[in-house]
Amino acid sequence: MSNGKSLIILASFLFLHFSFITEEALAQEFSYAHATVITPKGVSIPVEVSDTPEKRSLGLGKRDKLEKGWGMLFVFERRIPPSFWRKHMRVPIDIIWLDNQRIVELAENVPPPQEGESPKVMEPRLPSNFVLELESGRARDLGLKVGQKLSFKF
């Protein structure tokens, strides 16, 4: 077999192999750094840090649950009104938008999309550079409110 044919066969194999990688498989490839978010009342919340476009795109999607007491902190390089949609979400969550660690908006008990439903897009009215996702009801349990400042330990 000529080198040209071997190269074409190899390239075809690699293309087919990599075209079947799913978002779920990609999620397993991500290694998330951990940090701690501290509430005004001093409660520490361990979080996974989602700080790349790929990690932010997947977020908590494809997970059947959040670990009890844990959350995910999305970090953006600049202040924007980051939109979030619930694609591939399986559990309800609270979404908290922060501008320089100050809460600018809360969306509590946001349900996952129903089967066949287009995921709802959620966007804050004000720019922010962090978004915290927690298990549904946790923001209320912690007494979190717009205007409060959270602390981060990276």
State each model region's role.
Residues 2-10:
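Bacterial N-terminal signal peptides that target proteins for export
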